[in-house]
């Protein structure tokens, strides 16, 4: 998690041989805010986009939020985002597409293999210790 926090420098713990952040009210607040609100994820993503744009010297475009996407997007080139989306033709409708996930397939012997039956089933075997035959005195 690193980083110097306000009024809590990392302390060196010799038995773990590592630097630890002091676990006080400040660090708890940082942890819980990142944990529950997800603000750090959006900030990190925006920072990444800004770093890419600073590298490529592209004009910065901010796409305003729509009702289903609550936060505004950063677009690198505006033209791609001004093109209206493609209309889905009935040929590429979802009912004709193969289902995602494991599918049965024709294997090398050209026999149909069901994905659930091809899975290896491990049966617990009962280990019986080998017992020598009782040695009878002659």
UniProtKB/Swiss-Prot annotation:
Biased composition (Low complexity): 85-98
Disordered, as annotated region: 84-104
Record family assignment: To M.pneumoniae MPN_413 and MPN_463.
Name the record gives this protein: Uncharacterized protein MPN_091
Taxonomic lineage: Bacteria, Bacillati, Mycoplasmatota, Mycoplasmoidales, Mycoplasmoidaceae
């Amino acid at each position: 998690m690193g980083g110097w926090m306000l009024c809590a420098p990392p302390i060196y713990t010799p038995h773990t041989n590592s630097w630890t952040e002091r676990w006080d009210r400040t660090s708890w607040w940082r942890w819980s805010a990142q944990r529950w609100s997800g603000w750090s994820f959006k900030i990190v993503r925006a920072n990444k986009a800004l770093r890419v744009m600073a590298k490529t010297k592209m004009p910065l475009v901010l796409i305003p939020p729509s009702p289903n996407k609550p936060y505004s997007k950063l677009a690198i080139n505006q033209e791609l985002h001004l093109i209206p989306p493609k209309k889905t033709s009935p040929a590429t409708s979802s009912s004709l597409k193969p289902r995602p996930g494991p599918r049965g397939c024709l294997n090398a012997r050209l026999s149909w293999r069901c994905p659930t039956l091809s899975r290896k089933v491990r049966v617990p075997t009962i280990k019986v210790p080998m017992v020598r035959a009782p040695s009878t005195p002659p």
